[in-house]
């Protein structure tokens, strides 16, 4: 740093002196004696230096070295100071001009000093030789480093001396061998690296010294790649560089000065080398000693040398590798032939039209790996010539927008970016062409040279390769060959003409002879013509030349249009390819009259496209072929023909008009035109216009596929479809491929340029447009639009042509456009698209974008159909109002585009088609057939929850609602709107037609309403009137309303669809309508019958249950002042009813979330609506006696009293009568009581069996225990007598359970309760009746036990294995059941078989009473006995071998009958189990929680957010019947709104109901709560409260919320459904290609992995794992007096009830937690790899790529289906009673959301003993998140007496057990029962450990193993399958002797049948639960209970 500062100081001093003298105008310094100014500036500079040094500003320069380096490089080049960039004099340390002549010694001294200073740059360690020198110093000592430094110094000095002294004999050969120098240096480096890789410190020999010296010497000479480009610009002198010489006068002076400079460099370098040696000997050695001994690092010597050796070796290797690309390939090849690096001639093209390189031999140079044409450049991949022109440019890229305002025709979505041209590249790959040794341009140039004529003339020799003859025959035979070209029919008619034609086209004829022949022949024809000039003006001169042709008959051939088009193409190509040098002519100026007018060829296009029937087509075609060629050669300066003379004459206007008339007359007289008279133009003009219009429409239509034609660039996708998804026969496909490949011209279409017509110089223009419409114009003259006399002349000023073709579909081919296109390609495509990282990001982004939409936001198939029909009808309606039908091409446009571009059409296209065109191009898309969802971008219709609690609401309906309710209040009184059902379609959100209530099924839930106008027209009015009329009549009339109206409306959409298919098939329509109507009526009748049966059961059951239902104090209140409506309906009343109908279903009720998931399907909703309708009708019939009567207040009160008394009498009479007739009831009448009895009998029987079995075993072991068992039996009977109370299971159906003192009753007591106890009044217990019933039951029970008990044989035991009773209640493990006032202790034996003594039992009972306050309502858990794996395998083997045997050989005995009976028994038992679960488990719990679940809401804060579309608004159950008067009066002034169950509306109640349903309405309070809805359309116009203004917006595009959202109580937790309900069919693929850039080869889609279409927007959805989450019902914190009663649920219950005060999972988690370790399907080791059929379909019905493998596939998303129940471990200890009691002590917690977690890594268990916890439970590694406290509001509410043990935190899965804290309240009995905890180890396990013969490894096997490049979703994991290794069998002689011979199974057994049946039972239970847990059923059942409770008591 000091050196640098000193250098800059010296230069700045000199600069300062010069500038100062210049300012004072004093001469510059002539010597070094003027010290005044220098000293002054020197002082200032020293001050500046110290200032910079102490302020540490020099550190800035060090830190900013990466930024300074470019400045240094530029300073070197521009000769400014590197050390100080502020001054302009660079390295002029001393001026050479000072005393140059006067004192040579001073100059020599100056140069010597400059050399010393410049030697600094030579010693900088910038080259490999310096690195090697440094390594020699470090590794091999001072001597080796010194020798290496000398070698480097000698090499540098030699090179500098040879340059400065001008030793050409050395410099020029050495520089010309640059490749040799490079290779020599590289080889030396590689050898050095090889030798020194294992080199250590050693003593040097003389030979090694020379090696070291020579290596560095040669490297310094060869390696100029690092330092010399920079060192050449470094110098401290006034010269440009170090290597520059100095100006001298004579030769001795030259030697002296330059020798002094070189000596200075040598001296400086040698001094620096010596300095380095000194530094290495003293300071560096001391630093090394300090590092190795004293520093804290204390690196050992070996590691020190190892690190240094590694560092230097790698640095040297990096230098060697970095020098590889120093000489490029282009320089290496082109340097020997004299080209400079990056010579521009390498990239130069031959011409603008010919894209070949000028030097074809070096065409492969300067190609990047990602070059846009690298796939088809002939130098890289030699292709056939026809592919090169097609793909040489991306001509479809719209670069013309930047150039002169000419636009391409293609839209932005149809542009092609290379990767979507893969089908084209595939066709190129499939070409039958081998790679040629020579590139294409070489071969083509060779061919053209060989094809030259033998004696070329002077004119053709200049362009030999493209002579006219070569081009002519190449065009003729290679491209436009046709058999008619060679027809020789004309040879017989006119031999001379044929001969001339043959000569003119003969390959042997030279150009000169051909030209002479043609000119003379043409002159002869003109002289012989009868019409003279007029014949020349016409395009068709065959009339004069061949008069015999006029008399021949005109024939039109079918292939005429193709022949003519081929000829047209041929002539057009001849015109462009003819030698232009032969066609030079003088150009004369045209008249300005015609020059001012610009003529477009569109005007002439129709004329040229006319197809005239030619006479004797073959003859005339062959003549035309000749004539077209001859005519081009005719018009040359040499041919002085009459035609040219005539053209050059100027005609006056009058003469020109006469000429036109004569031409027209002659044409009409000599030629018969065949154009139709009625058309202005020939028919083919219109046909061609239509075709062109269709081609345009092809790019804009909504067609799913585009037609694959040769010229159409767009439909690459269809080629993909054909190759990958459709199966064609090979012959047909091969033929088509060959046909397309043969059309070379289509694929060779270049980027076209404008065709320019240049007029001849001396030509007169003839205005014959009228004439040309009727004359027969030769089609082949496309380049001659003004007739046959105008010939295209190509000159220098071709741009000034008059007639220019339109360029709207052309790409401009010019320098500017190509430059723009290339720049766009480089900037956009190469950087953004072709980068692999960006392509990967784009793929992920597109995947995420397509997967961001929830699956539930899709419309259903039927909704899409209905929406499509409505939009179609709406657009058809719009078409009638518009002028489209008067358009010229209306039919074509309508069929191609699909109708007009109205607003509805635009919305439809945007929604259904989307903008997936580019995605279709760039990404693979799976086609699919059938009815599937269509992916849309904007979804106005959401389908989040298919239940009726989260309906959307639009704010515009609010005002109508309030207006309507006011009107309704004034006009209506006792109207029950129940018989009019208004359906809210949960997916389409449209209010359907109100029809009379009946049980009907909905075909399409969106199909009844076609437009909103129908609700406002006469149809709605008629329906409303008929509805009100039916309301005023009796209830029977309402139900018997004709259903035909609705049947027609629901079939409307389906009829439209079928009519569109069979629009003319009337018989089909008739049959279809009759069939559909009959089927619908039949279905309705069946449903009605079924519903009636169910309702009868429900009524009997509810009536029988009267004694258990408490009375409600609510009675209907009626207003006598309001009269019922008359028959004459006023308009106000109709309007009010209209509003109520339209809004009755919009206000949803809050569904209380029960245990079961809220997954419903469409059928459940339909059935539920039908059931509700029936229930409402019957409710109205039973409850609404006073609906149509006019009553005063006194009358209504009297009637109410009488009604209450009567109902009480009737109900009590009914129940007592029912109790008496209970005994006489038939056994088949299976109600709840029957099932309860049956369950009790089964339970008693099985427990008795078990107890007997147990007693026998104990008696065998110890005979003394028999007496003890008798003693306990007597004790039991005493318990029955002493502890028996009035408790019944049916008490759970009571509203008020009698609260007595807590009693603990043995559970065996409860098994002997009387059956009819529930139906007897509690006050009058009939003892005789009870005993009679009991004895009766005992008699029947003993009878059945004796008669029907059958010993099961060993044969029958095999079939019994599938019995469901085995799983139902096989064993009863000890359990605790906590009821409201009762606790039962189940078993009275300990686990060791000993009986509990009386004292122990009493202690445990006392302990239970002490703990009663801590227990929540626990579930009665019955442990299903799980079969061990051994027994499961044994059963499966039996079944497997039996099935195989069944198919091999038939049994002659009764095995077949037994099998059939067994199957029937299994089905019956499955049904029986469902029945049992329904009656015993679900219905009692459901009724019990009915009242408690009437959870209430507090006042909510309502915020008006008009731009949201989703909200869930909870509401409450309404259980008290009121009249409509009550509803309307309290709508705006209530805190609690109660509505009757007959109203199909749900109003939010806002007061807290505790026990009674008496409604108190506080006056004066006006608050309302409104649910949130959405309308059908996405547009909203209304007031936005947050913006404070009126807005009109699209809600889908808005980020704001919309609607009225109700802020829920924070204590409530509302869970939404999982985002995907059902998924599409699983498509399969594997990514097997190994090509890096092979984009979407269809052959790689091998169907091995299952996936589905992932949802959009799943990133923002907080996904909760379904099985890890329990659906919680939280009641309010303040309602402590409301208690939920937990039912005794079925032993086969699927999901246990989860109430708010209990921990749902406690017992299950404790007892069965180890089951998660093992899996059910251990035997599924072989997974069949079946290929699934992936259906295909049109593009618009499937738009998602198939290779998006998602996390949320159904089999992985729902763990119930994925991870089945595990087997418990054999070492699991039976849990004691107190452990369960302790576990039930935990409090319920806040239900946290759970995340997807990674699976546990497999643990290698090498001879490990399984670790057993103290309490006998094995906790798995993969456990649930558990919480222990409940956060209610801001306070922690706990149900424990003890304090909270843990915070409200989730604990992660842990392998450690959560140890329970010892409780001080635990008694001695508890410790006694928990003392015996040791579980004995399996002796087989110990034997295994001793033998050490087997290593047990739990290996995870992947279900699907992805091959190379397989996809896994980001963040997902590959799912593993644990396969258990077989254990060693124990050698047991007795077991072996007892074994039977069994058939060995061939493959692993898959227990599918059992699992599927079990799964189906679960699904049925869920569906039944959901069907009966809906809000409406709750209300109806409650109404029946209220009806019974409110009836007067029996007198």
Swiss-Prot record:
Biased composition regions of type Basic residues, renumbered to the chain: 1422-1441, 1853-1863
Keyword field contains Transmembrane: yes
One Gene Ontology term, aspect cellular component: chloroplast membrane
Main localization of the protein described in the UniProt heading: plastid
Membrane-topology descriptor: Multi-pass membrane protein
Localisation: Plastid, Chloroplast membrane
Effect upon mutating residue 1588 to R: In strain: CC-503 and cw15
Region Disordered, annotated ranges: 1418-1441, 1848-1883
Keywords, ordered alphabetically: Chloroplast, Membrane, Plastid, Transmembrane, Transmembrane helix
Ranges that cross the membrane: 31-51, 53-73, 106-126, 157-177, 212-232, 254-274, 307-327
Effect seen on changing residue 1618 to A: In strain: CC-503
Family (UniProt): Belongs to the ycf78 family.
Stated role: Essential for cell growth. May be involved in binding chloroplast DNA to either the chloroplast envelope or the thylakoid membrane.
Name of the protein: Uncharacterized membrane protein ycf78
Protein species of origin: Chlamydomonas reinhardtii
Taxonomic placement: Eukaryota, Viridiplantae, Chlorophyta, core chlorophytes, Chlorophyceae
Gene name in the database record: ycf78
């Amino acid at each position: 740093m000091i050196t640098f500062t000193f250098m800059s100081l010296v230069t700045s001093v000199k600069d300062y002196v010069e500038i100062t003298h210049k300012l004072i105008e004093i001469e510059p310094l002539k010597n070094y004696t003027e010290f005044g100014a220098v000293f002054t500036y020197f002082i200032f500079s020293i001050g500046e230096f110290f200032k910079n040094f102490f302020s540490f500003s020099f550190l800035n320069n060090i830190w900013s070295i990466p930024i300074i380096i470019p400045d240094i490089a530029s300073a070197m080049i521009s000769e400014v100071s590197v050390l100080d960039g502020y001054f302009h004099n660079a390295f002029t340390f001393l001026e050479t001009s000072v005393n140059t002549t006067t004192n040579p010694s001073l100059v020599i001294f100056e140069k010597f000093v400059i050399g010393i200073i410049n030697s600094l740059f030579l010693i900088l360690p910038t080259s490999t030789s310096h690195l090697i020198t440094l390594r020699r110093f470090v590794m091999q000592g001072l001597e080796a480093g010194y020798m290496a430094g000398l070698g480097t110094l000698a090499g540098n000095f030699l090179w500098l001396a040879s340059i400065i002294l001008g030793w050409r004999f050395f410099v020029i050969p050495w520089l010309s061998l640059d490749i040799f120098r490079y290779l020599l240096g590289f080889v030396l480096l590689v050898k050095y690296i090889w030798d020194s890789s294992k080199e250590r410190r050693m003593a040097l020999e003389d030979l090694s010294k020379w090696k070291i010296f020579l290596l560095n010497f040669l490297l310094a000479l060869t390696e100029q790649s690092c330092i010399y480009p920079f060192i050449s610009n470094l110098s401290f002198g006034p010269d440009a560089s170090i290597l520059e010489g100095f100006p001298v006068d004579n030769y001795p002076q030259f030697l002296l000065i330059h020798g002094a400079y070189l000596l200075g460099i040598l001296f400086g370098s040698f001094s620096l080398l010596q300095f380095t040696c000194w530094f290495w000997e003293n300071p560096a050695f001391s630093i090394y000693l300090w590092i190795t001994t004293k520093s804290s690092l204390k690196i050992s010597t070996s590691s020190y040398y190892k690190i240094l050796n590694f560092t230097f070796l790698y640095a040297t290797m990096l230098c060697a590798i970095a020098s590889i690309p120093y000489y490029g390939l282009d320089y290496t090849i082109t340097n020997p032939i004299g080209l400079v690096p990056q010579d521009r001639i390498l990239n130069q093209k031959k011409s603008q039209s010919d894209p070949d390189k000028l030097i074809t031999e070096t065409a492969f140079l300067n190609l990047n790996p990602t070059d846009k044409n690298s796939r088809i450049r002939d130098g890289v991949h030699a292709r056939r010539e026809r592919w090169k022109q097609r793909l040489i440019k991306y001509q479809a890229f719209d670069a013309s927008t930047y150039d002169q305002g000419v636009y391409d025709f293609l839209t932005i979505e149809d542009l092609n970016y290379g990767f979507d041209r893969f089908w084209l590249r595939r066709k190129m790959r499939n070409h039958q062409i081998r790679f040629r040794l020579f590139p294409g341009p070489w071969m083509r140039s060779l061919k053209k040279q060989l094809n030259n004529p033998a004696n070329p003339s002077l004119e053709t020799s200049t362009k030999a390769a493209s002579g006219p003859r070569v081009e002519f025959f190449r065009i003729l035979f290679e491209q436009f060959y046709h058999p008619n070209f060679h027809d020789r029919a004309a040879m017989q008619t006119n031999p001379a003409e044929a001969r001339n034609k043959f000569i003119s086209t003969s390959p042997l004829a030279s150009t000169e002879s051909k030209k002479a022949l043609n000119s003379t022949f043409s002159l002869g024809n003109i002289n012989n013509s009868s019409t003279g000039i007029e014949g020349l003006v016409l395009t068709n001169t065959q009339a004069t030349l061949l008069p015999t042709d006029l008399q021949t008959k005109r024939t039109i051939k079918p292939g005429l249009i193709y022949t003519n088009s081929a000829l047209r193409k041929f002539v057009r190509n001849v015109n462009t390819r003819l030698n232009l040098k032969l066609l030079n002519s003088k150009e004369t100026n045209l008249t300005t009259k015609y020059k001012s007018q610009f003529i477009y060829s569109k005007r002439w296009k129709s004329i040229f496209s006319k197809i005239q029937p030619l006479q004797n087509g073959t003859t005339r075609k062959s003549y035309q072929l000749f004539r077209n060629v001859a005519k081009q050669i005719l018009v040359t300066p040499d041919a002085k023909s009459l035609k040219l003379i005539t053209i050059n004459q100027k005609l006056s206007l009058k003469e020109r008009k006469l000429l036109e008339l004569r031409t027209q007359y002659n044409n009409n007289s000599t030629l018969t035109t065949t154009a139709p008279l009625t058309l202005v133009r020939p028919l083919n003009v219109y046909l061609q216009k239509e075709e062109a219009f269709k081609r345009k429409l092809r790019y804009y239509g909504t067609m799913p596929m585009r037609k694959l034609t040769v010229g159409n660039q767009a439909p690459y996708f269809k080629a993909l479809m054909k190759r990958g998804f459709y199966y064609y026969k090979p012959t047909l496909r091969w033929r088509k491929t060959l046909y397309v490949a043969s059309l070379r011209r289509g694929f060779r279409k270049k980027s076209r340029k404008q065709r320019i017509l240049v007029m001849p110089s001396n030509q007169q223009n003839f205005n014959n447009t009228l004439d040309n419409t009727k004359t027969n114009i030769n089609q082949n003259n496309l380049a001659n639009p003004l007739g046959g006399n105008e010939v295209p002349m190509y000159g220098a000023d071709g741009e000034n042509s008059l007639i220019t073709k339109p360029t709207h579909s052309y790409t401009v081919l010019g320098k500017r456009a190509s430059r723009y296109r290339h720049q766009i390609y480089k900037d956009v495509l190469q950087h953004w698209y072709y980068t692999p990282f960006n392509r990967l990001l784009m793929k992920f982004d597109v995947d995420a974008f397509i997967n961001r939409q929830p699956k539930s936001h899709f419309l259903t198939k039927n909704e899409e159909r209905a929406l499509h029909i409505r939009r179609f009808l709406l657009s058809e309606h719009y078409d009638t109002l518009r002028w489209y039908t008067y358009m010229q091409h209306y039919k074509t446009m309508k069929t191609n585009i699909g109708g007009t571009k109205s607003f509805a059409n635009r919305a439809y296209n945007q929604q259904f088609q989307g903008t997936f065109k580019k995605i279709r191009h760039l990404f693979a898309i799976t086609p699919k057939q059938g009815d599937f969802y269509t992916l849309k971008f904007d979804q106005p219709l959401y389908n989040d929850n298919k239940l009726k609690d989260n309906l959307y609401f639009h704010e515009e309906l609010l005002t109508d609602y309030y207006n309507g309710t006011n009107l309704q209040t004034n006009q209506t009184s006792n109207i029950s709107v129940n018989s009019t059902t208004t359906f809210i379609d949960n997916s389409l959100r449209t209010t359907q037609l109100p029809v009379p209530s009946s049980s009907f099924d909905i075909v399409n839930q969106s199909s009844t309403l076609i437009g909103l106008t129908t609700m406002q027209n006469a149809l709605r009015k008629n329906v409303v009137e008929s509805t009100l009329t039916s309301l005023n009549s009796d209830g029977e009339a309402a139900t018997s309303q004709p259903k035909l109206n609705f049947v027609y409306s629901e079939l409307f959409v389906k009829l439209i669809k079928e009519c569109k298919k069979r629009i003319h098939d009337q018989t089909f329509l008739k049959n279809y309508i009759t069939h559909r109507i009959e089927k619908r009526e039949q279905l309705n009748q069946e449903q009605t019958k079924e519903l009636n049966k169910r309702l009868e059961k429900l009524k009997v059951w509810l009536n029988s249950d009267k004694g258990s239902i408490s009375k409600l104090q609510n009675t209907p209140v009626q207003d006598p002042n309001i009269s019922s409506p008359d028959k004459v309906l006023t308009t106000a009343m109709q309007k009010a009813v209209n509003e109520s109908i339209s809004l009755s279903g919009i206000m949803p009720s809050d569904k209380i979330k029960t245990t079961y998931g809220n997954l419903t399907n469409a059928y459940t909703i339909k059935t539920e609506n039908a059931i509700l309708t029936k229930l409402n009708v019957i409710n109205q019939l039973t409850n609404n006696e006073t609906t149509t009567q006019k009553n005063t207040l006194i009358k209504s009160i009297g009637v109410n009293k009488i009604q209450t008394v009567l109902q009480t009498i009737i109900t009590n009479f009914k129940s007592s009568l029912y109790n008496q007739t209970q005994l006489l009831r038939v056994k088949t009448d299976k109600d709840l009581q029957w099932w309860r009895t049956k369950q009790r009998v089964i339970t008693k029987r099985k427990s008795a069996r078990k107890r007997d079995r147990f007693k026998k075993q104990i008696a065998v072991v110890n005979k003394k225990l028999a007496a003890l068992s008798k003693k306990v039996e007597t004790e039991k009977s005493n318990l029955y007598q002493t502890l028996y109370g009035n408790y019944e299971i049916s008490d759970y159906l009571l509203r008020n359970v009698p609260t007595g003192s807590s009693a603990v009753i043995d559970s065996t007591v409860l098994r002997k309760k009387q059956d009819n106890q529930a139906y007897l009044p509690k006050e009058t217990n009939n003892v005789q009746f009870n005993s009679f019933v009991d004895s009766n039951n005992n008699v029947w029970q003993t009878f059945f036990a004796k008669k029907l008990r059958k010993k099961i044989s060993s044969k029958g035991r095999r079939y019994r294995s599938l019995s469901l009773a085995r799983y139902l209640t096989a064993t009863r493990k000890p359990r605790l059941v906590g009821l409201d006032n009762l606790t039962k202790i189940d078993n009275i034996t300990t686990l060791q078989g000993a009986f509990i003594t009386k004292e122990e039992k009493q202690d445990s009972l006392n302990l239970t009473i002490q703990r009663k306050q801590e227990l929540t309502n626990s579930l009665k858990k019955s442990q299903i006995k799980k079969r061990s794996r051994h027994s499961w395998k044994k059963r499966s083997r039996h079944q497997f071998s039996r099935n195989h045997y069944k198919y091999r050989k038939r049994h002659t005995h009764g095995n077949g009958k037994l099998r059939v009976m067994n199957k029937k028994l299994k089905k019956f038992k499955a049904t029986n189990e469902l029945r049992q679960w329904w009656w015993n488990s679900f219905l009692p719990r459901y009724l019990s929680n009915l009242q408690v679940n009437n959870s209430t809401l507090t006042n909510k804060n309502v915020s008006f957010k008009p731009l949201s579309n989703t909200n869930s608004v909870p509401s409450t159950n309404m259980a008290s019947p009121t009249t409509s008067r009550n509803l309307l009066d309290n709508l705006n002034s209530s805190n609690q709104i109660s509505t009757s169950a007959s109203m199909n509306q749900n109003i939010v109640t806002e007061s807290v109901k505790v026990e009674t349903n008496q409604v108190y309405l506080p006056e004066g309070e006006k608050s309302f709560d409104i649910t949130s809805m959405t309308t059908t359309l996405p547009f909203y116009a209304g007031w936005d409260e947050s913006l404070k203004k009126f807005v009109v917006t699209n809600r889908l595009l808005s980020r704001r919320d919309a609607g009225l959202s109700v802020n829920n109580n924070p204590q409530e937790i509302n869970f939404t459904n999982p985002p995907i309900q059902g998924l599409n069919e699983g498509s399969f693929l594997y990514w097997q290609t190994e090509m890096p850039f092979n984009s979407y080869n269809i052959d790689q889609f091998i169907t091995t992995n299952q996936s589905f279409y992932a949802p959009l927007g799943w990133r923002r959805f907080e996904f909760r794992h379904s099985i890890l989450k329990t659906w919680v019902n939280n009641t309010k914190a303040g309602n402590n007096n409301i208690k939920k009663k937990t039912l005794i649920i079925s032993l086969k219950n699927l999901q246990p009830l989860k109430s708010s005060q209990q921990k749902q999972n406690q017992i299950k988690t404790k007892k069965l937690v180890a089951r998660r370790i093992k899996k059910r399907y251990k035997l599924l080791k072989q997974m069949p790899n079946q290929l699934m059929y992936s259906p295909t379909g049109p593009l618009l019905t499937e738009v998602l790529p198939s290779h998006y493998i998602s996390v949320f596939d159904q089999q992985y998303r729902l763990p119930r289906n994925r991870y089945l129940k595990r087997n418990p471990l054999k070492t699991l200890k039976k849990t004691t009673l107190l452990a369960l009691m302790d576990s039930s002590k935990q409090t319920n917690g806040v239900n946290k959301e759970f995340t997807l977690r990674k699976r546990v890594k497999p643990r290698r268990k090498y001879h490990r003993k399984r670790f057993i916890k103290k309490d006998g439970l094995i906790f798995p590694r993969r456990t649930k998140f558990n919480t222990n406290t409940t956060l209610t509001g801001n306070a922690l509410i706990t149900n424990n007496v003890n304090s909270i043990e843990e915070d409200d935190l989730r604990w992660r899965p842990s392998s450690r057990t959560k140890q329970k804290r010892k409780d001080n309240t635990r008694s001695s009995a508890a410790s006694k029962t928990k003392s015996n905890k040791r579980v004995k180890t399996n002796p087989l396990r110990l034997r295994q450990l001793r033998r050490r013969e087997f290593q047990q490894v739990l290996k995870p096997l992947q279900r699907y193993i992805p091959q190379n490049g397989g996809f896994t979703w980001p963040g997902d994991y590959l799912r593993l399958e644990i396969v258990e290794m077989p254990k060693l069998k124990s050698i047991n002689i007795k077991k072996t002797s007892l074994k039977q011979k069994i058939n060995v199974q061939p493959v692993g057994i898959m227990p599918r049948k059992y699992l599927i049946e079990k799964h189906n039972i679960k699904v049925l239970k869920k569906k039944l639960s959901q069907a009966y847990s809906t809000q409406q059923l709750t209300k109806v059942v409650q109404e029946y209970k209220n009806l019974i409770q409110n009836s007067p008591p029996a007198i």
